[in-house]
Structure formats: structure tokens, C-alpha cells
Amino acid sequence: MGKIAFVFPGQGAQKVGMGKEFYETSPIAKEIFDKASEAVELDLKALCFEENDDINITEYTQVALLTTSVAIMEVLKDRGIKPDVAAGLSLGEYCALVAANSMNYIDAAKAVRKRGIYMQEEVPAGVGGMAAIMGLESTEIEKAIADIPQVQVANYNCPGQIVISGKKESVEQGAEKCKEAGARRAVMLNVSLSLIHI
């Protein structure tokens, strides 16, 4: 068998219902959700499983994603699927630290909860934004947004997918300019943050 890599998502991957099936069918996942909820004094089960708008607010999103990712990872590990390597995008780096046994999930949940609160304080909801630009070279994206204030390239995810970040209105304008320049898609991400603000 080849090597196994676990790659963990950053903010923007959240959705209501994430982790629910694992919670309902795995004692391991249930324990992770319950202990993390207690540690951060937040009902992560309600946050992740019930319809709400808080799931998209940074101060809640980050700990919810971390807890869900760790719960799924631990279920996989219990079933014999263990990572040889782990990596994460932004917030996902904390999950990778847990996967590498460099940080326990309770400490990670506490750290990420504080991180989310501080980030939310720095960039209130609706002020910042990010957009994934697909099918356009980085040099073309950089040209398309060059004259727009308060927007910049934030992530070079992979060839063909680059994320721009900044003031929400500027990001929206940048996404449109990228489409005009030939981008296959430009998708506003479900985040209220931006690199330019942090």
C-alpha cells in the first residue's frame, strides 16, 4: 500500500450538518465533540448539526471545523486508516498538528477558539472577504486586481486555483475582473476574514 496523507481544510469548508453522522454512529467522534464542547464552553453539537448562522462566524467556525476534522480523523484511525503525513490549509494546520501528535485536540480546540475570537474582533463579519479564482494563471490574476485597492492574492492553493483576499467589496470587484480576464470560475468564499486585515 502507498503512503496515506491527511489534508485538512481551512475556514470556508464548514456547513451545517458536518460531522453529524460520525457523532451519531461513532463513540469516538461523540467523545471528541463532547470533550471539546466542554473545554471551549460551547455547544459544538448544536453549532455543527442544527440550522444556524453562527457556523459561518469566524469565532465559532474555526473550533467547529477543527473538532469535526479531528473527530473524522480519529474514526478513520480507529478503522486502521492512519496518516503517514498530514498537512492543513491555514486553520487545518492545527488539525495536522493533532494528527502528528504534536498537539492534543483539547489544547488545539482551546487555541483555535481563541484564534477565532481574535480574528473576528480584528475583522468583523461582512468587512473582509475571500474568493477562489479557478482557471486563470497567477500572473493574470495579479494583473486583474492590480488597480483595485485593498485586495491581494492570499493563497496559491494549486495550479489553477488561487484565492484573493481583502475588503469584501474589493474582492467582489476583483473576482469580476478575473472573470473578465478569462477565469473559468470566481467563487466568493463563505468567510468573513481577509489576509489584508490580519
Kindly give the residue locations of the regions a language model identified:
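Helix-rich "cap/lid" substructures immediately adjacent to catalytic or cofactor-binding pockets
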Residues: 2-87, 164
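Generic anion/oxyanion-binding catalytic loop in active/binding sites
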Residues: 18, 58, 97, 130, ...
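Alpha/beta catalytic cores of group-transfer enzymes, especially the acyltransferase/condensing modules
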Residues: 11-13, 40, 100-195
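Gly/Ser-rich oxyanion-binding loop with an adjacent helix/lid
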Residues: 62-132
